[in-house]
Amino acid sequence: MCGDNIFMKEDYLTSYILSDIGKAYTWQKEFYRAEEDDVTWNEAYSVIYTCNLVLSEVPGINEGKDAYKAQVMAEAKVNRAFYYWFLHSCYAPAYDPETAGTDLSVPLVLEPDLNAKVRRATSDKVVAQILEDLKDVAMDLPEKSASEYHIPRMAVYGLAARVNLFFGNYDAALENAEEALKFNSELVDY
């Protein structure tokens, strides 16, 4: 629901009028009732928790190949970066480098602690963490993934290009886009 090219038929809308979807579509002030959860927020932080758990536990594992451990850690960082970018896009003001030091974004949770008291971080801190998570992890990932459940190197470059473009880092966006296109520059012919 982040775009403006959305249309709902009347019967669909009225069947969901009390749901968060119906409320968002009709621009209601409050999307959720007190007993409802924000599924988008909860699911994103659930994935972030899992990524944090992987990042804290994998370095202590003595068995296994170092290359595989590096790949698992890289996938966790990429996923965490993606979900923080997604959360920042949904719940924070549009990124402005001049006000990023004071604009509040989302809580920046980097440890797998379910009981931690969290506060909203400033946009500049969230953006810095997103970019840090995407930095230098591509080489730990395979050029082609073994399955659709694993992240290939091209996807990291593509995400880094998009994130840098979103935050106004145009040179880095171009550099990452060119790296991604080295793997596949063909358009899909529908």
Residue positions per predicted region:
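Acidic, glycine-rich segments characteristic of secretory precursors and extracytoplasmic regions
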Residues: 1-7
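Short coil/turn linking the two alpha-helices of tandem helical-hairpin repeats
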Residues: 88-95, 145, 166-168
